[in-house]
Amino acid sequence: LKHFPLITAHTGCMNTPENTLLSVETALRSEADIIEVDIRVTRDGVAVLAHDEILRLPDGASLSISQSSFEELEGVDLPDGPGHAGTHRLVRLESILPAVKAAGKMLNLDLKADEAIEAAGELTARYGMAGRVLFTGCGAERARKARGRCPFVRRLLNADAGLFRTAGPAEAARIACDDALSAGCSGINIDYRLAGSGLLKAAARQGLPVYVWTVDDPRKMRHYAELGVRGVTTRNVEALVCLKKEWESAPS
């Protein structure tokens, strides 16, 4: 029986607002192995949890994260996003690290800008979490920059979706593996819809585990677990945890 994949709780898991303390706290209370958050950096170098560069405010105004200081942003009420009626404040990456470390979880930092590499790496080192952090959101170029600036943090190559749609699966898999190896990546992170058995086999030959995102359908979770992926990112953490318990209780 294959090992069950690592469970990554996507930010906003279990119907919480994305990139909020509530989302992180909910993920920490779950049986997920890895907590995912999106990372951007303010003008003064503060790593924050945010997907988009432009913050849309309830009154229709907008603010640029990279062009604003953290002090300018920290008091702003931000909409919780689609499906949520509340607001939240911008969260510093540093503020969640002690709880993640204490919980013994891993952290998937989805880097949304090159500037996030050093800010996130410095905090990872300061909190002694190099063994618990993965950098994702890295195409080949960003992965190479991350290796140069923060070689102590493991990276996953974000496979180029466009390549898989244009080059054909075998050639795209070969290029993804070559890019991952040349950038010193620990594995490949890919949209589950592009992760076929050909990629898994090609990556396995190179010693590269494959992680898939974002799988919320329990039937698809089972399919990718059986295919042999190393990790599955999901918003539906409870369903993946249930499948894991069923998987591990099955006779070998």
Residue spans of the language-model regions?
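Phosphate-group recognition and catalysis centered on beta-loop-alpha active-site segments
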Residues: L1-S252
